[in-house]
Amino acid sequence: MNRRQFTLATALCAALPMASFGQEAKLLTLEEISEYLNGISAVESSFTQVNWDNSISTGTLLLKRPGRIRLEYDEPDSGLMMAIGGNLAVFDKKSNVPPERYPVRRTPLWLLLQRNVDLTDQKMVVGHGMAGGFTFVEAMDPKRPEYGSIRLNFTSDPVSLTSWLIMDAHGGETFVDLGPLKEAEINNENFNIERMVQQLVPEENR
């Protein structure tokens, strides 16, 4: 293990929640995970992120399925990521330049945001098992490895998404550890990319 790998592993262990003692964790089936994800309507949570360079960021997650997600980072970070209608935009709120844009289908987050999740019928699933008391499922597009992969981690009692790890095609890893997911009334304006462009980007730079 090289120094970078050791540092990343240490950061992941610090961020990763431990399964509660006294509760016997069980392996969730792909059917159970699919049912859980399809049951998510609108939730919010705090999060802690371990970035590819081992720096730590915090922020707030808004998730409104299908298709909508917003991750807004706390200061001093200036990042904002939002997706709606199949489009994902990544803003640097201090840059005064337009966001980077990607089709959601070309990102690992598609697994989480698609309308009907059926992991039993997904050729994208490349891993499923237990680690550290959590059930994990790992997915990637075998025809498009350059899109990267995502590993979702779940508790079993109650069933809940606790974290994810995104790995890009170059070996970079980004780990997101979620706080408790809370049901919420979330206005769709929170995912309005064009409105955010108008707010953050001077007209001459759009």
Which residues are covered by each model-predicted region?
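Boundary at the C-terminal end of the N-terminal hydrophobic targeting segment
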Residues: S20-E24
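Gly/Pro-enriched, hydrophobic low-complexity segments
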Residues: T120-D121, V126, M130-R206
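Bacterial N-terminal signal peptides
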Residues: T10-P17
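Short hydrophobic/aromatic-rich beta-strand segments that constitute the beta-sheet cores
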Residues: F47, I69-Y73, L88-F91, V137, ...
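A short, Trp-centered hydrophobic/proline-enriched beta-strand micro-motif
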Residues: E35-N54
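N-terminal export leaders
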Residues: R3-T7
